[in-house]
C-alpha cells in the first residue's frame, strides 16, 4: 500500500523514504470486489494519488499529505481501466485539517476530512465504513488495501486494489525501526506490519484504511521506502483518538480543535 510522508517533512523523507500516497499493498492478493465498497481513489486530477475512506454520503477521510489543489475522488472503483456501472466521481466542497496550517508531522495530525460537492448514493459497490467504537489492541490482525505499488522496490502498480493481513504492533517497534526521525515516546499513530517482512502497504496506498478485528482503526501515513522490509513496519494515524474532531466537523462544528 502507499507510503506517504508528512508535508512538513517531505524534503527529508523523499531522500530515503517513500510517501505512501502512491504505493500498493506488498505481498497481498486482489481484493474481492465486494470487500472495499468504502474505499475511494483520489486523483490529481487525472493521476492516481491516494486512497480514502467513505464515512457517509458526503464525507471522506484520508491523510493530510494527500492534499492537492485539484483533487478528484472516484467512488465505487475496482479496476482503474474498466469502470463499474455504479462508479461515481466527486470533487471536494470543503477540506478540513487538524491544523489550519497543515503542519502535520511524522507522528501527529496526518489526517484530512473532505466534504464532497454532492452526496453519493449507496449502491452495489459504494457504501460507507463505520468509525471505531473502541480502541485497537496490540496483536490484532489488521486488513490493509489499496492500488499502491505491489513490488517492494520496482514501479509496479496494479489495475485493481490489493489486500493483505498484517499485525498491529507495539508502538515501540516503530520507535526502534526509525531512530533517525526522533519519534516521540508516545504518539497518536499506530505501528503495523509483519516483523518478518513480506507484507506491507507501499507507495500509492497512503490515506487508505487499517481495519483491525473488523474496525476502522488507522489511516496509512508513512513507512520505509523499501516496502515489506524486515523489522520496518508502517505508521498509521490513529482514528480512535480523532473521533471527537471527526464527528464534530461532520455535525457542523468546524471550530473544534484537534486532540493535543
Swiss-Prot record:
Write the signal peptide boundaries: 1-18
Example of a GO MF term: toxin activity
Quote the Pfam families the UniProt record gives.
Trypsin
Name the Enzyme Commission number(s) assigned to this protein: 3.4.21.-
Active-site positions on this chain: 65, 110, 206
Q: What tissue specificity is annotated for this entry?
A: Expressed by the venom gland.
Q: Which residues form the propeptide?
A: 19-24
Check the record and name the InterPro entries matching this protein: Peptidase_S1_PA, Peptidase_S1_PA_chymotrypsin, Peptidase_S1A, Trypsin_dom, TRYPSIN_HIS, TRYPSIN_SER
- The source's superkingdom equals Eukaryota
Q: Which UniProt keywords apply?
A: Disulfide bond, Glycoprotein, Hemostasis impairing toxin, Hydrolase, Protease, Secreted, Serine protease, Signal, Toxin, Zymogen
Q: What is its main location?
A: secreted
Q: Which residues are glycosylated?
A: 103
* Compartment(s): Secreted
Protein family membership: Belongs to the peptidase S1 family. Snake venom subfamily.
Q: What does this protein do?
A: Snake venom serine protease that may act in the hemostasis system of the prey.
Name the UniProt record assigns to this protein: Snake venom serine proteinase 12
Amino acid at each position: 500500500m502507499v507510503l506517504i510522508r508528512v508535508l512538513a517533512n517531505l524534503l527529508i523523507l523523499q531522500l530515503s523514504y517513500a510517501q505512501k500516497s502512491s504505493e500498493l499493498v506488498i505481498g497481498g492478493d486482489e481484493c474481492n470486489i465486494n470487500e472495499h465498497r468504502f474505499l475511494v481513489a483520489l486523483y490529481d486530477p487525472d493521476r492516481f494519488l491516494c486512497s480514502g475512506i467513505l464515512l457517509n454520503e458526503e464525507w471522506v477521510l484520508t491523510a493530510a499529505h494527500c492534499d492537492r489543489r485539484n483533487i478528484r475522488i472516484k467512488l465505487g472503483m475496482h479496476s482503474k481501466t474498466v469502470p463499474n456501472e455504479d462508479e461515481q466521481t466527486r470533487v471536494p466542497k470543503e477540506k478540513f485539517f487538524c491544523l489550519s496550517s497543515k503542519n502535520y508531522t511524522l507522528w501527529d495530525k496526518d489526517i484530512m476530512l473532505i466534504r464532497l460537492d454532492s452526496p453519493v448514493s449507496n449502491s452495489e459497490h459504494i457504501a460507507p465504513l463505520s468509525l471505531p467504537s473502541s480502541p485497537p489492541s496490540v496483536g490484532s490482525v489488521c486488513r490493509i488495501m489499496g492500488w499502491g505499488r505491489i513490488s517492494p522496490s520496482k514501479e509496479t502498480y496494479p489495475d485493481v486494489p490489493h489486500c493483505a493481513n498484517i499485525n498491529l504492533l507495539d508502538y515501540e517497534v516503530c520507535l526502534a525501526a526509525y531512530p533517525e526521525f526522533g519519534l516521540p515516546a508516545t504518539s497518536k499513530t499506530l505501528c503495523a506490519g509483519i516483523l518478518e517482512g513480506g507484507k506491507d502497504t507501499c507507495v500509492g496506498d497512503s490515506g487508505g484504511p487499517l481495519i483491525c478485528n473488523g474496525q476502522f482503526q488507522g489511516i496509512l501515513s508513512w513507512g520505509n521506502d523499501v516496502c515489506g522490509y524486515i523489522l520496518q513496519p508502517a505508521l498509521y494515524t490513529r482514528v480512535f483518538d480523532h473521533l471527537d474532531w471527526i464527528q464534530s466537523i461532520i455535525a457542523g462544528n468546524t471550530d473544534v480543535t484537534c486532540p493535543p
